[in-house]
Amino acid sequence: MSSIAKTPHPPYYAVIFTSHRNEGDSGYCEMSERMVTLAARQPGFLGVESAREGVGITVSYWTDLESIKNWKSNIEHLEAQSLGRKKWYSSYKTRISKVERDYEF
């Protein structure tokens, strides 16, 4: 993902996923692409931005907290979360924020 997500006027929500990866891929890239595709089909999904240079940061944008809750409990996403804990990440943190203002150029 190399583009900046097009989001509506605030308010909306951001889920910020920060991670450190373990060595090796072991299916990570395929699962990551699958999760972006699947998330984009979820009600309330607005967009996603991602970058990795040592530490990885993925920010997904959502219309409301209920949509985030539904995404977190999606069966395929639950499997990806489990695999992430078992083999892909040495550590991670998820934060959820309400976006009150945004600016762009």
Feature roles, as predicted:
Residues A80-K87:
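C-terminal structural segments of small proteins and small subunits
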